[in-house]
UniProtKB/Swiss-Prot annotation:
Pathway: Amino-acid biosynthesis; L-histidine biosynthesis; L-histidine from 5-phospho-alpha-D-ribose 1-diphosphate: step 7/9
Lineage, broadest ranks: Bacteria, Pseudomonadati, Pseudomonadota, Gammaproteobacteria, Alteromonadales
Record-level Gene Ontology MF annotations: histidinol-phosphate transaminase activity; pyridoxal phosphate binding
UniProt keywords, alphabetically: Amino-acid biosynthesis, Aminotransferase, Histidine biosynthesis, Pyridoxal phosphate, Transferase
One of the protein's GO biological processes: L-histidine biosynthetic process
Homology family: Belongs to the class-II pyridoxal-phosphate-dependent aminotransferase family. Histidinol-phosphate aminotransferase subfamily.
Protein EC: 2.6.1.9
EC class of the enzyme, as a word: transferase
Protein's recorded name: Histidinol-phosphate aminotransferase 1
Amino acid sequence: MAEFNALELVNPGVKQLRPYQAGKPTSELQRELGLQHVVKLASNENPLGLSEKVKTALEAELTDLVRYPDANGYYLKSRLAELNEVGTQQITLGNGSNDVLEILARTFVSDKDEVIFSQHAFVVYPLVTQAIGAKPVAVPAVDYGHDLDGMAKAVTDKTKMIFIANPNNPTGTFLSTSALKSFLDKIPQHIIVVLDEAYYEYVPEDQRAPSVEWIKEYPNLVVSRTFSKAYGLAGLRAGYAVSHESVADVLNRIRQPFNMNSLSLKAAEVVLDDHAYLQKAVELNAQGMQLLTEFCEESGLNYIPSYGNFLTIEVGPGAEKLYDELLHEGVIVRPVGGYELPNHLRVSIGLPEENQAFIKAMKKLRG
């Protein structure tokens, strides 16, 4: 009897996929190298830790965990609708924004379609595209960011969805309001445009696009956001999309009824009103960003100016080697060769002492 091989049974798109490589956990490095103290600057998490208000709310929630969560997420959706000045029927909740991106692809894209995104953009875009069997169309980047003119020209009669990350991960590049608006004007309404704003809160308020307001004018626009970054809930998995109500209606037909658990629903609801926590997170990020960019400039290292909570630094052909050497110094960063950036490392902004640990290790290793 021939040996069973599940790979022979899957759809063609899945055959080409490789498992997503997340940032290395601190516990894994401690086990591997026997290190006591490890600094993780690999996954763009909030270094402040959990909001104290969230901690208190979660403790009160523990007694009810034998019950299923609210499948509709009424209270969280109501709060999000209020903040975004939309109806609750325009909100789709996700188990992190990755879940939202997958729901969008499964809802609108078939194996006969094409999906457009930028080179150096978030790896989940090609992942969800190929999983369906659709054709991924990666448009070459300009200055490490989206070439919106090139993306508009890449549209064909097979295009069904376009992903735009603003700010972009892993490069941190940012698209202006006028550039985005001009792009949306060029895209026909039968193509869904997903504006992934995972790092929205780190963008200065006077530079943020009124993306949710645009949905009235562009009903094919979907705005995706997450609680994993500035709101500090990466481990609880909470995200959402705002869209035209007819789009949200079909998304919620695909969405699993309990895709957000009770703790993530409560945490997301509470942290939205912890304004002091969010402000502190944004200020801490700005200070850390300044420290790292100054270090790069003093060290003669090129970097990509970033609007996120990370900095992608050009370290040369030995990027993978330097990554391994940093691991032995107890510092975890992110190699981005998989994003066609083999000479770069992405460094998350941490606490002041964590940023200093990275700088100290870099000075030791690079002389």
